[in-house]
């Protein structure tokens, strides 16, 4: 476990004896601060601007550059409205520190680790700095293993790697939030793990909706907050670029505590990883750096690497990260998504077409990919079943134009059989979710990987050709499908 430098308290009174400087220039969210000779703060140190006399001002900044002549350039994490030249600035002597541990569950924090949910202060004395080194190679768990989610379409066709990084692609209204909440629920029940959600530069309304839905579905337990399964960290669209650039690190730091100290499996959600890059680009321009390709910051790869390399499995536990990826103008060659792809182990693509058919989760079985789907990692049986499922669905996709023009009757006997099995597979890839029980009335189902493979093997073998396709819709394992078929006949 890594040891961290001492922390600073949130009260200015506790840092009265620290170095003091004063503001000499303000350009938007960027401040230049002069310090006495020989008392310069380090890069990434947190500075606190103290209001004059009775003014209650508490603006936190982070040192980004040492300019010479005893001056530093810092980026503000809060609005800089009301700041003036000459105001006193206190060097805390340490990077931004945030609360960590079980008391963070069920709470909402900002980039500085301050609770913003009006539920009072966080009951913890344990804090970590947000700038931490990635685990040393000797600490890493290099064994590749599957992270079972209990969601059939994910586990069979695009399995997640334990301690891996998954890109989540999908537009509005296709079920991203429900899928995220189901994963949070399943990791808590099946793996005894917890989750941290980092809202990076997205809409405040979306953050509020997610919080309300989590309370409604039981992921956040209002009556007993300590039984909640997730901690939320928000740095929304309206906040300064410094806050949006660092909020991902705040969420990651909270996740690292659960992995390194509590030795748990953790799910870390980042929504949206593109906004992290976008905020870095804004800060880079404000600091006067020469832009690189398409106007992005020259340090793009370094910034992305410093975040992504901390997301990994160690011998203590794992952080498995699911990152929503916005692709600007649908251009996959744009430097921001292209840099992100280099770090991903799997992609989960949500399809509007499947959502329109009522097949949930609307994960596209042909577009979703995973580097884990190899015979030596998942076994021959799993690999063969997944490939046959994809081949059947691909053939069905190719035949759809012919069916639309000529109808099913014009197909050969073999193709008709393929279509019938593909439609059953498509429906069997749907699944009732625990977090959707309150909306659908159907009890949620966690389906183990072994049960999933058996179910699809039976459909592909033709043993279930006599069952109606609606028997496979929104069920858990294959036994439930056969029971549903019996009920449909009676």
Curated annotation (Swiss-Prot):
Give an example GO biological process: proton motive force-driven mitochondrial ATP synthesis
Q: Where does ATP bind?
A: 170-177
Provide the alphabetized UniProt keywords. Answer: ATP synthesis, ATP-binding, CF(1), Hydrogen ion transport, Ion transport, Membrane, Nucleotide-binding, Plastid, Thylakoid, Translocase, Transport
Q: Which InterPro entries match?
A: AAA+_ATPase, ATP-synt_VA_C, ATP_synth_F1_bsu, ATPase_a/bsu_AS, ATPase_alpha/beta_chains, ATPase_F1/V1/A1_a/bsu_N, ATPase_F1/V1/A1_a/bsu_N_sf, ATPase_F1/V1/A1_a/bsu_nucl-bd
Enzyme Commission number, as recorded:
7.1.2.2
**SUPFAM superfamilies registered for this protein in UniProt:** C-terminal domain of alpha and beta subunits of F1 ATP synthase, N-terminal domain of alpha and beta subunits of F1 ATP synthase, P-loop containing nucleoside triphosphate hydrolases
Please describe the quaternary structure of this protein. F-type ATPases have 2 components, CF(1) - the catalytic core - and CF(0) - the membrane proton channel. CF(1) has five subunits: alpha(3), beta(3), gamma(1), delta(1), epsilon(1). CF(0) has four main subunits: a(1), b(1), b'(1) and c(9-12).
Protein family membership? Belongs to the ATPase alpha/beta chains family.
UniProt protein name: ATP synthase subunit beta, plastid
Task: Name the species this protein comes from.
Answer: Cuscuta reflexa (Southern Asian dodder)
Q: Name the lineage.
A: Eukaryota, Viridiplantae, Streptophyta, Embryophyta, Tracheophyta
Gene that specifies this protein: atpB
């Amino acid at each position: 476990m890594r040891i961290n430098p001492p922390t600073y308290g949130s009260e200015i009174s506790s840092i009265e004896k620290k170095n003091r400087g004063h503001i000499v220039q303000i350009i938007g969210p960027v401040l230049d601060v002069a310090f006495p000779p020989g008392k310069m703060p380090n890069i990434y140190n947190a500075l606190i601007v103290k209001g004059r006399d009775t003014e209650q001002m508490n603006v936190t900044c982070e040192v980004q550059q040492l300019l010479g002549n005893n001056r530093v350039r810092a980026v503000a994490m809060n609005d800089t409205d009301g700041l003036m030249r000459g105001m006193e600035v206190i060097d805390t002597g340490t990077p931004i520190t945030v609360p960590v541990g079980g008391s963070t569950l069920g709470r909402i924090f900002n980039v500085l680790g301050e609770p913003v949910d009006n539920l009072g202060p966080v009951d913890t004395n344990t804090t970590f700095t947000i700038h931490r080194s990635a685990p040393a190679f000797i600490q890493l768990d290099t064994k590749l293993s599957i992270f079972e989610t209990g969601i059939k379409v994910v586990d069979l066709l695009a399995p997640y790697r334990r301690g891996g990084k998954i890109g989540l692609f999908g537009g509005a209204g296709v079920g991203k939030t429900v899928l995220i909440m189901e994963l949070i629920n399943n990791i808590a029940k099946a793996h005894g793990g917890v989750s941290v959600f980092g809202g990076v530069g997205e809409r405040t309304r979306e953050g509020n909706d997610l919080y309300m839905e989590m309370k409604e579905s039981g992921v956040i337990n209002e009556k007993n907050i300590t039984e909640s399964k997730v901690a939320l960290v928000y740095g929304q669209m309206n906040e300064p670029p410094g806050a949006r650039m660092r909020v991902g690190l705040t969420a990651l730091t909270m996740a690292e505590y659960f992995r390194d100290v509590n030795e748990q499996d953790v799910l870390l959600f980042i929504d949206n990883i593109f906004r992290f890059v976008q905020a870095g680009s804004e800060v880079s321009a404000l600091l006067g750096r020469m832009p690189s390709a398409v106007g992005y910051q020259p340090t793009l790869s370094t910034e992305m690497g410093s975040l992504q390399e901390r997301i990994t499995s160690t011998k203590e536990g794992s952080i498995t990260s699911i990152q929503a990826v916005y692709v600007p103008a649908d251009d996959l060659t744009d430097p921001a998504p292209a840099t992100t792809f280099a770090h991903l182990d799997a992609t989960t693509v949500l399809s509007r077409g499947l959502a329109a058919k009522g097949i949930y989760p609307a994960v596209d079985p042909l577009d979703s990919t995973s580097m884990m789907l190899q015979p030596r990692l998942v076994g021959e049986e799993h690999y063969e079943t997944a490939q046959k499922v994809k081949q059947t669905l691909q053939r069905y996709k190719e035949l759809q134009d012919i069916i639309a023009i000529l109808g099913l009757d014009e197909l050969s006997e073999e193709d008709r059989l393929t279509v019938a099995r593909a439609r059953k597979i498509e429906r069997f890839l749907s699944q009732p979710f625990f977090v959707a029980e309150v909306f659908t009335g159907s009890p949620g189902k966690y389906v183990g990987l072994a049960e999933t493979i058996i179910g699809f093997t039976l459909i592909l073998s033709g043993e279930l050709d006599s069952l109606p396709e609606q028997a496979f819709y929104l069920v858990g394992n294959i036994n439930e499908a056969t029971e549903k078929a019996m009920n449909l006949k009676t």
